[in-house]
A protein has these predicted regions:
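Glycine-rich phosphate/pyrophosphate-handling loop used in enzymes and phosphotransfer proteins
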Residues: 1-181
Length: 181
């Protein structure tokens, strides 16, 4: 009852289109959710992502939640997640994808959900790691432990958003360490 009154005077709005959210909607309205270009890689063993990494790394499974298009809805939401402090977007995406991934047999043997870490300087600037809530939501839905200490960023690299896929791979190989203790 009280939450209904709060919503009446301070309605929540969609992170994508800014329209008011209905009571059952969380962060993103139904209309915008249906516009998101879902990749459905988790139902295809041989998909775009797996082919992109073929011959570069040993990959047993690869999937992505959405297709990314420049100036598209996904880019806008990721920008708000990373730079505008809307961490709830990550949690919602993680919950949606966690539900989808429950049907993937190979993930039942996964040891951890591991987020890509930020360097301490960038973490202080942003205030949080934008993939933390995504990873925690995946972890909860898949019942796989969340581990944010095993992968460590050694260097504070410049933003890679304008670099090619292959250049990002080169940079990443020397940027991270694994700590097993």
């Amino acid at each position: 009852m009280f939450s209904h009154l709060i919503n009446l005077f301070y309605p929540k709005s969609c992170a994508a289109c800014a329209s008011f959210l209905l009571m059952q909607e969380i962060v993103i309205c139904t209309g915008c959710r249906h516009q998101l270009p879902e990749a459905n890689h988790h139902v295809m063993e041989d998909n775009d992502l797996v082919r992109k990494f073929y011959g570069r790394i040993r990959l047993e499974f690869g999937a992505t939640l959405f297709y990314f298009h420049k100036a598209g809805l996904v880019q806008d939401l990721i920008h708000k997640l990373k730079y505008k402090g809307l961490g709830d977007i990550g949690e919602v995406f993680g919950s949606w994808y966690g539900e989808d991934l429950k049907s993937v047999a190979i993930l039942k043997n996964a040891d951890f959900v591991i987020p890509v870490p930020l360097h301490q300087k960038r973490l202080r600037e942003r205030g949080y790691n934008q993939v933390s809530k995504f990873g925690m939501a995946l972890s909860a839905h898949l019942n796989i432990p969340y581990n944010d200490w095993v992968l460590v960023r050694k260097f504070n690299t410049k933003t890679q958003s304008r670099k090619s896929f292959f250049r990002r791979i080169d940079i990443s190989e020397s940027t991270f360490d694994v700590e097993l203790t």
